[in-house]
Amino acid sequence: MASSNPPPQPAIGDQLVPGAPGPSSEAEDDPGEAFEFDDSDDEEDTSAALGVPSLAPERDTDPPLIHLDSIPVTDPDPAAAPPGTGVPAWVSNGDAADAAFSGARHSSWKRKSSRRIDRFTFPALEEDVIYDDVPCESPDAHQPGAERNLLYEDAHRAGAPRQAEDLGWSSSEFESYSEDSGEEAKPEVEPAKHRVSFQPKMTQLMKAAKSGTKDGLEKTRMAVMRKVSFLHRKDVLGDSEEEDMGLLEVSVSDIKPPAPELGPMPEGLSPQQVVRRHILGSIVQSEGSYVESLKRILQDYRNPLMEMEPKALSARKCQVVFFRVKEILHCHSMFQIALSSRVAEWDSTEKIGDLFVASFSKSMVLDVYSDYVNNFTGAMSIIKKACLTKPAFLEFLKRRQVCSSDRVTLYGLMVKPIQRFPQFILLLQDMLKNTPRGHPDRLSLQLALTELETLAEKLNEQKRLADQVAEIQQLTKSVSDRSSLNKLLTSGQRQLLLCETLTETVYGDRGQLIKSKERRVFLLNDMLVCANINFKGQLEISSLVPLGPKYVVKWNTALPQVQVVEVGQDGGTYDKDNVLIQHSGAKKASASGQAQNKVYLGPPRLFQELQDLQKDLAVVEQITLLISTLHGTYQNLNMTVAQDWCLALQRLMRVKEEEIHSANKCRLRLLLPGKPDKSGRPTSFMVVFITPNPLSKISWVNRLHLAKIGLREENQPGWLCPDEDKKSKAPFWCPILACCIPAFSSRALSLQLGALVHSPVNCPLLGFSAVSTSLPQGYLWVGGGQEGAGGQVEIFSLNRPSPRTVKSFPLAAPVLCMEYIPELEEEAESRDESPTAADPSATVHPTICLGLQDGSILLYGSVDTGTQCLASCRSPGLQPVLCLRHSPFYLLAGLQDGTLAAYPRTSGGVLWDLESPPVCLTVGPGPVRTLLSLEDAVWASCGPRVTVLEATTLQPQQSFEAHQDEAVSVTHMVKAGSGVWMAFSSGTSIRLFHTETLEHLQEINIATRTTFLLPGQKHLCVTSLLICQGLLWVGTDQGVIVLLPVPRLEGIPKITGKGMVSLNGHCGPVAFLAVAISILAPDILRSDQEEAEGPRAEEEKPDGQAHQPMPDSHVGRELTRKKGILLQYRLRSTAHLPGPLLSMREPAPADGAALEHSEEDGSIYEMADDPDVWVRSRPCARDAHRKEICSVAIISGGQGYRNFGSALGSSGRLAPCGETDSTLLIWQVPLML
């Protein structure tokens, strides 16, 4: 019944009536958009025809529901609908249960979003509408007022009815997955009229996209009218951007719509157009196959199971198993109809991106796919149990598989929705690569790529969480209810970080392998659990659906007590006297005197062969000494040949060491606490696991290390979401605060931080596990100084888990900026081809450039810490150097007086030409505060304007205003994908601009995410900005650091998820945010430099001194064969040596082709023709597919250290540095494998 009072602001999940007055536009942050068809005829017959249940109180002001058949439609296919019917014969409401709904006239109902509750329900009676993405064709959209509606903003006309608006691609599309977009425009957001001034092209884009949608989807709209019996849009919720729309189930006719089909290829197409047509054909073919798979799930499995008597599977279980399959099919059926229309007119429009945006940017798609993904594990569990307990069901699945043409199982069909969006992403990436700049489809493709990536990321995260819950539940079932482990697992405070099946090995007293067995190892956030795997089930069932194992817990231990120990590790890290090594039948203590405190684990044959080579080398050296006493001169028996034997044996020893290292790459040795011995002394026992590949071992070692760091007080918790539940844990990928160190070793001077860069340098001395646990290898260069005094540079080594200072040197003036300049790819290749250079000073190496306050520009080599200044110069007019950037052509310096100085490369391309006068360009009247180097352009900021320069000629192309306030300056610019995020000298907002159109796309208010940490703090300013690994780091002048997720791919890097705030920050402004990245390969035990220099150094040894290996520091693997070896290192023939040939045979013909050294059984000497194989040994099968490992750390610099977690209840604690000391905080990110 109607109420005289205005309705209150609706809460999330409340039911809304379509006609109820919504909140005013001033109070809304994201009102979204309501697509409606204008209709005024026959509305009163709608609810009676549909039989809609009334789930909300009736109101007199509610408009009746709209029946699409009431709209006059000219059907191109009159035979599709029988005459005399108000509803087409091929439209129905699905299940028979719908007949129970009748008599409702004015109604609307809502279902709460499945993401708002921990557990979703399976509605038995409520049927849901599927598709609401049909654009409205309201004539109001073409009025002049519509031009004021911006792409990512909500600037509504005062008093305009929301139902009549049509924004084309509106905020509801682009913010559909945002979880806190309502906070972006609340405080300190300028009026829309100011924003329009720097968006001249975006409104044109919106109109063009709208026009394209109207022209390209007209047939789609008509088809939707014919095929959808109900389309309902709700009013927008007040402060929520989530569209909790109802879903009414709609059955689609069996009559197939026309399949999308490309016409014949026109003549005169460019190569890119031809490729785009082929990619479109792949999209059409892939989508058709996917829709057919969804139909097979319903027609071949769900419908027969529902109709089967007696039932092999109950109706309730069928609903659970096939939950949301029909809705997904309806979504893609609509998309296929729209795709068919777009394909038919492809040669005239060549646009496809806007279709993906319109079809998959709605929260409805995320809802149905989220429900499906969350339900997938439970559905497979029901199928598995039914196969084990109901033979009729198992026989049904086998029969259906045999009858299918491709023999795909039900599991193979049901896993396709999980794989669908990654397939879309790959196709759109290919399409974007072949779409030139300026093409009308390019921006829409970038937006579509962003939407699909965001959707896929959310689904992946939900799938990961669902699998994590399933694994913990499966593990909990194997534990007794009364055990302490059960209480820990069921407390809800445990987070599964890593879970994998490893092979546990047991060795004998002499190191021989006795037995091995697979174990399931669980790494939780505070404990490590090992369980036996017990598979029970028929083999024929596992071919139809994956069978989950049952676990029997073998042992569990607290994480801080677990230690990773490498074979041959020094005894200083643990007490070998109390270590128990698992042997067959019993555990025996390893005496400290046995085997020189070294334990040989694994196949001992490699160690034995290495020892044999050592003994043989000693014998050959004695022979060499005897040969030196010969009085005669012989061609094949002299000191040259003898030294060649020695060098060859040394090389073979290195090959054997490589094999030992390779075996150790997959061997994970864990030292665990054991029961005390009889005297009460604590003991430990060693467990050895074999990982599936080297990457797996690296992942385990890294996650174990970071999980221990995560248990420290400062990381409990380390990150908070402003509105998250206190019981929830931060995502497993969150950076972990690893250490807090003083920025300068000398505290006598009050030095202020200026800049920081990371110089990646691989350390060949680090072991396999040390690389997995250490920070990104290389050196940190930290620069700063004191106002009016000198500057200082501090160099830290990161080749250990905690940084340490290795060098510090003073400068004449404070350091304001730094830039790391890597070597060009062609330079690196030329250096690899010619490793020796005539002039060592001309050797190409990465460099580090420093800009000082007195106008000096200094260039240093970054290979070592010798800190030799390679070149230096003074800026024009001795202006302070505020920023430095490099491009392939120039070293760019932004100066205080608004000048951009460009230094070209030298003629040899090794260094920058700092001696000649630079190319100078005046950017503006104010200082050039930041520079950004793109592929084909350079962006320079001066005040609120940004100037775009051509990369090679530095000619200004265009400029634009990034901020409407002339007193505000652009201070930071960072690029991600096809966008650039900017921060300003004042204000709490950051803005996103497109790299190609220069249009303003999004604005985020940082203050809304920090108010709960700094209550009452109104004046907040962004002081630093960084994008790395899909995360946007924002530093503020209050010492707070905010983390926002952004897309990683080539799309638009708009922020769509919730931000997180670090509880660890600084006492003052965050001076800078920098990233340290090093790329490692699985074969990281020896660097290329060490391998390349090794043979040269040995060849230069005059005495042929034997290399002293350390065979007892590694574990090897068995050789598959043992053959004779030709001891030949450098000599291919001794014919050139003086003296006769010592042989009882006749000399061979002197044709120059025969070798005096014949191979005894030397198949191993295939390596003789390839020197690199000598060094690198033969490739290991497990290393055939090598991947890069990316180690990442984030460094922030500022005054002091503050833990905001303790500050919430008190004034905060400051440790370990003082408030005024310059401090570095280093966050470590899990290895990107």
From Swiss-Prot:
Residues 1-10 have a biased composition (Pro residues). The keyword Flavoprotein does not apply. PROSITE patterns: DH_2 (PS50010). The modification Phosphotyrosine is found at Y131, Y152. GO terms for cellular component: cytosol. Acts as a guanine nucleotide exchange factor (GEF) for RHOA, RHOB and RHOC. This is Rho guanine nucleotide exchange factor 10-like protein. It comes from Pongo abelii. The gene is ARHGEF10L.
